[in-house]
């Protein structure tokens, strides 16, 4: 990484890795899960509450922040950390995925992507240079290069063309990023599910040189089996002495499978989005708190969980406030889900340090196979 930032690999267990990404704003223990703060907030959570779950780093969305309140406004107000009251590291995505999935009337050229805002219809150009400028204005600690993320399935020619465009954009991103001591720039591997295209992409990224490397273009509709098939080779194509980031993943079993295959970092809106829709994640799997079976249940979501929702509230209460559409429902379930995710990451870090990831994985799947506790 650039000066004052580094990656230290501490232990391995099979392909699973544990270590520390050291940044001027603090250490990021890996494997790490990054809660998503789309619009400079993790929905339904105070920043100090997110930190209390054990999160070392948040993710911010370049596309959303450039449109509202604008990167220039955030910079004038002291940068994203100050703006959202988060003093730990922040990673920002490049905006490419959201442009291709959310924006209206988009046009893709060699220069970048011209699009109209989904908010007010205003016209914008997002290019490698503009993405680097926006992320610098935001002041994020880890910056992602600008790429195109094609939806799967896609034919080979489309994947090949897209990958080559992303590699040209990666080189432009690196040049535009410049020399920024203490800040890191990650490249993004593309190539769909094709091993040779992934290798060609990884080779191009290695030649450019980045502080970390993401496996991009997965979790876009291909299904878990296909994703794991790709992860059986894609992380191995990336440098071993740099962090590896799987973008947009995911469910707990996706995360465990990714770590097993050598991934160090992940992000996903799932734990917070699920919390707002009455879904809780526990070591036994998913709990739908809206179901009538919970209406008279005095037990916690998970008797072994130490989050505020499990320490202080019953399933009956959580069922009631969700059915009554009270704001505290989303707050408590989101806190629980983020706490569960961070506990999962810590358990994996401990297992890797003890060279027992296989044992952890067996226990993880055995717990989930039991299913939720029996109704009263």
Curated annotation (Swiss-Prot):
Pfam family, one: TGT
Active site positions, chain numbering: 93 (proton acceptor), 267 (nucleophile)
Keywords, sorted A to Z: Glycosyltransferase, Metal-binding, Queuosine biosynthesis, Transferase, tRNA processing, Zinc
Signal peptide coordinates: none
E.C. number(s) listed in UniProt: 2.4.2.29
GO MF annotation list: metal ion binding; tRNA-guanosine(34) queuine transglycosylase activity
Database matches in SUPFAM superfamilies: tRNA-guanine transglycosylase (SSF51713)
One GO term of the biological process aspect: tRNA-guanine transglycosylation
InterPro entries attached to this UniProt entry: ArchSynthase1/Queuine_TRR (IPR050076), TGT (IPR004803), TGT-like_sf (IPR036511), tRNA_ribo_trans-like (IPR002616)
PANTHER family: QUEUINE TRNA-RIBOSYLTRANSFERASE (PTHR46499:SF1)
Summary of subunit composition and partner proteins: Homodimer. Within each dimer, one monomer is responsible for RNA recognition and catalysis, while the other monomer binds to the replacement base PreQ1.
Protein name: Queuine tRNA-ribosyltransferase
Organism field: Jannaschia sp. (strain CCS1)
Lineage per the UniProt record: Bacteria, Pseudomonadati, Pseudomonadota, Alphaproteobacteria, Rhodobacterales
């Amino acid at each position: 990484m650039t000066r004052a930032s580094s990656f230290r690999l501490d232990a391995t267990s099979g392909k699973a890795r544990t270590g520390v990404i050291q940044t001027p704003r603090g250490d990021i223990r890996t494997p790490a899960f990054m809660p998503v703060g789309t619009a400079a907030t993790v929905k339904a959570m105070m920043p100090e509450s997110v930190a209390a779950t054990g999160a070392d780093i948040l993710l911010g969305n370049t596309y959303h922040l450039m449109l509202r309140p604008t990167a220039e406004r955030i910079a004038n107000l002291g940068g994203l950390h100050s703006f959202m009251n988060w003093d730990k590291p922040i990673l920002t995505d490049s905006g490419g995925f959201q442009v291709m999935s959310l924006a209206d009337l988009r046009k893709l050229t060699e220069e970048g992507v011209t699009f109209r805002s989904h908010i007010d219809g205003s016209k914008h150009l997002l290019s490698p240079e503009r993405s680097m400028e926006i992320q610098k204005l935001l002041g994020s600690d880890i910056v992602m290069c600008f790429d195109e993320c094609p939806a799967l399935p896609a034919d080979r020619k489309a994947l090949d063309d897209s990958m080559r465009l992303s590699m040209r954009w990666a080189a432009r991103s690196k040049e535009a990023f410049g020399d920024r001591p203490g800040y890191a720039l990650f490249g993004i591997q593309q190539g769909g599910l094709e091993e040779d295209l992934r290798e060609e992409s990884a080779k191009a990224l290695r030649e450019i040189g980045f502080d970390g490397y993401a496996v991009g273009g997965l979790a876009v509709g291909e299904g878990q089996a296909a994703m794991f098939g790709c992860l059986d080779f894609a992380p191995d194509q990336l440098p071993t002495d740099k962090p590896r980031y799987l973008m947009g993943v995911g469910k707990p079993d996706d995360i465990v499978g990714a770590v097993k295959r050598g991934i160090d970092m992940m992000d996903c809106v799932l734990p917070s989005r699920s919390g707002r829709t009455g879904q809780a994640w526990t070591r036994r799997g998913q709990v739908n708190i809206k179901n009538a079976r919970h209406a008279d249940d005095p037990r916690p979501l998970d008797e072994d969980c130490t989050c505020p929702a499990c320490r202080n509230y019953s399933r009956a209460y959580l069922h009631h406030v969700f059915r009554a559409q009270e704001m505290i429902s989303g707050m408590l379930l989101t806190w629980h889900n983020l706490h569960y995710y961070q506990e999962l990451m810590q358990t994996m870090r401990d297992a890797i340090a003890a060279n027992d990831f296989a044992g952890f994985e067996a226990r993880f799947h055995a717990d989930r196979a039991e299913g939720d506790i029996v109704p009263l």
